[in-house]
Amino acid sequence: MRRIVVGVTGATGAVLGVELLRRLKQCPDVEVHLVLSRWARTTIHLETELSARDVEGLADVVYSWDEQTAAISSGSFRVAGMVIAPCSMKTLAGIRTGYADGLIARAADVTLKERRPLVLVPRETPLSEIHLDNMLALSRMGARIVPPMPAFYNHPASVGDVVDHIVTRILDQFDIESPSAKRWNGVPGAKDSSLKVVNY
């Protein structure tokens, strides 16, 4: 059984965290430990038709945002890694500087120091120099920065299609297969020698 910690912050894009939880719930070998930040509850209410309690029901273990005595606040509690989706710029900055003012940042700090996979899904646009500097620093520390950027080669027909692809890329970081994934497999019927570079 693999334990994966999921943090959901108050940044817009609550559906990313919700869909990630739904997909993880379908994995019989994964135990999900969830933390919703204070503002995540508000964002979930504003952006989805779910309540915070509905979202918590998708996890195996749920912690309060300020529960610093939680199991996931210690490196001796073994987990396979952590995802923060969506990840606010405040949370990102806190993780970069080691300022763990809540359980999400503390669990991320532990994940980094234990050299376990930490996947951050930053939600902000445009990005300032501060945001970019924080992401670069965290990437150098070993965190995986997975911005929720859509792919268009799979011809998404809905927001759901876009979210599905982004969540697939998040799950890829843990080698968790997605049956619904629409992956790039090259140009159908084309040979490499026939492809030409076109300058616009």
Regions found by a protein language model. Name each.
Residues 1-119, 125-200:
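A cross-family phosphate/adenosyl-ligand binding-site feature
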